[in-house]
Design a protein with these regions (language model features):
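Conserved glycine-rich cofactor-binding loop
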Residues: 13-15
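Conserved glycine-rich Rossmann-like NAD(P)H-binding loop of the short-chain dehydrogenase/reductase
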Residues: 27-44
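Conserved NAD(P)H cofactor-binding loop of Rossmann-fold oxidoreductase domains
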Residues: 89-94
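Substrate-binding pocket helix/loop in short-chain dehydrogenase/reductase
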Residues: 97-99, 105-110
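Active-site helix of classical SDR
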Residues: 121, 159
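Residue(s) in the substrate-gating loop at a strand-loop-helix junction
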Residues: 141
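C-terminal helical subdomain
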Residues: 183, 204-241
Length: 266
């Protein structure tokens, strides 16, 4: 092991979180994994320790449960783990139109992608202030720059925009205290997330030139976070789209989004 520092990664059992664990471990960081699937976490922790000669621990938690952030933080404190990097990566999808979703599902969606991020971030910001430094990776989305799309995207984009603003607020308020937050905003990334959430047909419809490999996304995200970058968007096309969304007049952007969603905006 190169050091005694740990990286805490939520949503670590698959997809981007799985690759992030490998990227950090390959750089000598010890890892704390958390997700809902104990079998996958156990297998991944063994794999990381064997391959990279680091320490890897895991705590099973469902971030749709409002008590989960406190339980995860308590686990780290009880095991005296020096967490120097927090990765807010856990995901949640709703494969239904907005008018068809039930309140329980919406509550879980908002808790996983919003409330749990706030609570985990606050717990570890307090620790980072004591230790004098810390880094936070906010795994957001390219969707955070654009107006909400149709279906599940009506909620997804706005929540990810909130995550970005929270990351910005961390930098504004705590950068002078040694704490940085990096908003990682990938576009279409090839993972098992879309299959598991019943949206593989939507992913298949995306042109291949718009898709990014999950390993390259994870590698770039880790490098950006370690450098303390405020925002990182992978790939030229995604960067260009993010730029357009930032400079295009809001009314025009909404009209274009409405057309793409099959609707109209007058």
């Amino acid at each position: 092991m190169k050091n005694s520092e740990y990286v805490l990664i939520t949503g670590a059992s698959a997809g981007i979180g799985y690759e992030l664990a490998h990227q950090f471990a390959s750089r000598g960081y010890n890892i704390v994994l958390t997700a809902r699937r104990s079998d996958r976490l156990s297998q991944l922790s063994d794999e990381l320790m064997s391959k990279f000669n680091i320490d890897a621990k895991y705590v099973t938690a469902d971030l749709a449960n409002t008590e989960a952030p406190m339980e995860i933080h308590s686990f780290c404190k009880e095991h005296n783990l020096d967490v120097s990097i927090l990765v807010n990566n856990a995901g949640y999808s709703i494969n239904k139109k907005f008018q068809d979703t039930d309140e329980e599902t919406e509550e879980k969606f908002l808790t996983v992608l919003g409330t749990s991020v706030v609570h985990l971030t606050k717990y570890f910001v307090k620790d980072f202030l004591v230790r004098g430094s810390g880094k936070i990776m906010m795994v957001s989305s390219l969707a955070s720059f654009a107006p909400p799309s149709s279906g599940w995207g009506m909620m997804y984009g706005p929540v990810k925009t909130f995550v970005n603003r929270l990351g910005d607020a961390i930098n504004i308020n705590y950068n002078s205290r040694g704490i940085t937050a990096t908003n990682v905003c990938p576009g279409f990334t090839i993972t098992e997330f879309h299959t598991a959430s019943g949206m593989q047909d939507k992913m298949d419809a995306v042109p291949s030139f718009m898709k990014k490999d999950v390993k390259s996304v994870a590698r770039g995200a880790v490098e950006a976070t370690l450098k303390g970058k405020q925002v990182w968007v992978p790939g030229f096309l995604n960067k260009f789209l993010a730029f357009l969304c930032n400079v295009m007049p809001a009314r025009l952007l909404i009209k274009i989004s409405a057309r793409l969603a099959g609707g109209r905006y007058e």
